[in-house]
Swiss-Prot record:
Organism encoding this protein: Brucella suis biovar 1 (strain 1330)
Anything else known: Transcription of the operon is maximal in early exponential phase.
Residues spanning the signal sequence: 1-19
Cited function: The VirB system could be required for the establishment of the replication niche in the host.
KW Methyltransferase (keyword) present: no
Source organism, top-level taxon: Bacteria
Keywords: Signal, Virulence
Name of the gene: virB9
Entries under NCBIfam families matching the protein: VirB9
UniProt-listed Pfam families: CagX (PF03524)
UniProt-recorded name of the protein: Type IV secretion system protein virB9
Induction: Specifically induced within macrophages by phagosome acidification. Induced at 37 degrees Celsius in minimal medium, suggesting that nutritional stress is a regulating signal.
Coiled coil (UniProt feature): none
Alphabetical list of InterPro entries matching this protein: Conjugal_tfr_TrbG/VirB9/CagX, VirB9, VirB9/CagX/TrbG_C, VirB9/CagX/TrbG_C_sf
Length: 289
């Protein structure tokens, strides 16, 4: 007896497990149904004779291929991310006679396989009896909790990176002096510092920003790219750290001198001087994560 029970248990454990995923009905109407996507699930779709149904996939997803084990008895029409389906009559030829067969519950059940440009789906199609059967589906709509969670994580990471990029950097050098040219005090900055990568100049409110020029050892000048700090519109950010720069606006001129100039600047160990942000170079076509 014990051997028999053990054999039954082993057979049960070795048997395949079939568990069709049944969509849940809307609280407003049970015929509007929802199901979470899982690539390992087979989803049950219950239909009625003479009544169409539709399966709705993710927005932006496009159906590429539809296959079924009983295409003679079912009609399928794909439109972007929606698949319309309906059981249909079929005609059989026997002894030179044509016999029309209407869809019949229990005999029209089959499987359905859908391939989109993003995922693969498997279904059991079941034709149900009774016109008022509340278990049938007019619409089966997929939800994607894993994709939504991944998108939320990616969005949160993007916000963190953007916040770090927008954050005001920590100054590493305040040791700046300046020489004010004749009648040039109106374009003189009130504050100067650098973070080892960029130079930051603060100006009184409502003043025009001067153009900045890098002064080379041979005293030649070249323009320096700059932008206004979005979090502090009175600060002009120069995209260089240099020993000497010149500010010009019309005939006005200011000399800016970095008295603690470090030609090596701040080492960018992660490809960027922004704390917590790492620069990653990927090959063409490689997805960014």
């Amino acid at each position: 007896m014990k051997r028999f029970l053990l054999a039954c248990i082993l057979i049960t454990l070795a048997s395949p497990s079939w568990a069709t995923k049944i969509p849940s009905g809307s609280k407003y109407d049970s015929r509007i149904q929802y199901v979470d996507y899982n690539s390992g699930d087979v989803v049950l779709v219950r239909a009625l004779p003479g009544v169409g149904a539709r399966i709705v996939f993710a927005p932006g997803e496009n159906i590429e291929d539809v296959a079924s084990g009983f295409t003679q008895g079912w009609e399928f029409k794909a439109s972007h991310n929606i698949l319309y389906l309906k059981a249909r009559s079929m005609t059989l030829s026997h002894s030179n006679q044509s016999i029309d067969m209407a869809p019949e519950p229990g005999k029209w059940d089959t499987n359905l396989m859908v391939t989109t440009d993003q995922r693969m789906y498997d279904f059991d199609l079941r034709l149900m009896p009774g016109r008022n059967n509340q278990r049938v589906a007019y619409r089966v709509q997929f939800r994607y909790p894993a994709a939504a969670a991944a998108a939320a994580v990616a969005a949160a990471q993007k916000r963190v990176v953007q916040a770090r990029m927008n954050a005001r950097p920590s100054p590493v050098n305040w040791n700046y002096t300046m020489q004010v040219g004749t009648n040039s005090a109106s374009i003189a900055p009130t504050l100067a510092y650098d973070d080892g990568r960029f130079t930051y100049l603060r100006f009184p409110n409502n003043r025009d920003f001067p153009a900045a020029f890098l002064v080379a050892e041979d005293k030649s000048e070249s323009i320096v790219n700059s932008h206004i700090d979005p979090s502090a519109p009175d600060i002009l950010v120069l995209h260089r750290v240099a020993k000497q720069m010149v500010l010009r606006l019309g005939n006005k001129v200011i000399g800016i001198y970095n008295e603690s100039f470090n030609p090596d600047g701040v080492p960018a160990r992660d490809g960027t001087t922004v704390p917590g942000v790492k620069r990653v170079i990927k090959s063409p076509g490689e997805n960014l994560q």
